Each structure stands twice: as structure tokens, then as C-alpha cells.
A protein has these predicted regions:
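Short, charged cytosolic
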Residues: 1-12, 96-112
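Membrane-proximal, non-transmembrane alpha-helical segments
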Residues: 1-30, 34
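Coiled-coil heptad-register positions
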Residues: 31, 38, 45, 85, ...
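Loop-to-transmembrane boundary segments
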Residues: 18-24, 28-31, 107-142
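Short, structured coil/loop segments at alpha-helix boundaries
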Residues: 51-55, 99-114, 122-128, 151-154
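Inner-leaflet juxtamembrane helices
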Residues: 60-103
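N-terminal soluble segments of membrane proteins
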Residues: 1, 154-155
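Alpha-helical transmembrane segments and their immediate juxtamembrane boundary regions
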Residues: 28-78, 132-135, 139-153
Length: 155
């Protein structure tokens, strides 16, 4: 009937909007926290200007702690993304089952919504994976800086 068709279409649209919003929230929440990465990068470059071993060690410990905290936040967001993905699969699986025999464009709309949400989810995974790698870059630059400082003292 027209009523059940309209109801099913509304469910598809509502589900798509809900999951799009949840994916967007993951990226926006982590983007504010990811600002620690460029700040740490500045700190890692500052290691090259430090003169005492105590300063180097304190700066490096600060970089490591920042990388650990940033990584933990990113991993938490990755887990949240996995939970969102799982619930999306359950809901859209139910919708797929309910309209499997539908001959209207509703089935096509559902498949298009699922594809777009999967694309957004893949993008979120790539962003989070990139940020996880970038979170450790300042620490590695700091270690390289300290090694360069120690090189003249090795011989």
C-alpha cells in the first residue's frame, strides 16, 4: 500500500541521516583532539634547540605522553566507528529483508544509501588510521633530534 511504501521510504531516509550524523560526529570529535599533533610537532622541532640532556628527556617524555593520549582517543573513536557500523548493518539488513520483494525505486534508494554510508565509513577509517600514524610522528622526530644531538658525543 501507499502508506507502507511511504513509511518504509521514511525509515530508509531517517536511518541514512542518523548514521551520516554519527559518522560525522566521529570525525568532528577527533578533529579537535587531533590539534595536539601539530603542537607536538612544534615541540619535537624545539628539541633541536634544547641544550641539556635533562631538557631533551623531559621534552621527549612529553611527546611520548601526548602521542599515547592522542592514540588512545583515536583508538576509542575507531571502536565507536565499529559499533556504529555494526548497528548500521543490523538495521539496514532488516530494511533490506523487509523490502526484498519491493518493485519500486525504494530498493534502489536503500542500496544507494548503503553504498554512500559505506563510502563515508571507509573515509572515516582512512582519516582515523592516518591520524593514528601522525600521532607518533612528533615522537619519532624528537627521537631523531636527540640522536643528532648525541652523535657528536659518541666519538
Amino acid at each position: 500500500s501507499a502508506f507502507s511504501f511511504h513509511k518504509a521510504r521514511k525509515e530508509v531516509v531517517d536511518a541514512e541521516l542518523d548514521y551520516s550524523e554519527k559518522l560525522s560526529k566521529i570525525i568532528s570529535e577527533i578533529s579537535n583532539k587531533a590539534l595536539a599533533i601539530p603542537i607536538s610537532l612544534a615541540g619535537s622541532i624545539a628539541i633541536f634547540k634544547l641544550t641539556t640532556k635533562t631538557d631533551w628527556i623531559i621534552a621527549l617524555i612529553g611527546l611520548i605522553i601526548t602521542a599515547i593520549i592522542t592514540s588512545a582517543m583515536i583508538v576509542s573513536q575507531k571502536k565507536q566507528l565499529a559499533r556504529i557500523s555494526h548497528s548500521k548493518e543490523i538495521l539496514f539488513g532488516q530494511l533490506r529483508y523487509r523490502i526484498k520483494d519491493d518493485t519500486s525505486d525504494l530498493k534502489e534508494s536503500l542500496e544507494e544509501a548503503i553504498k554512500k554510508l559505506n563510502d563515508n565509513e571507509d573515509f572515516c577509517h582512512k582519516v582515523l588510521d592516518s591520524l593514528l600514524s601522525l600521532a607518533w610522528m612528533p615522537t619519532f622526530i624528537g627521537i631523531i633530534g636527540i640522536l643528532f644531538k648525541l652523535m657528536p658525543n659518541i666519538t
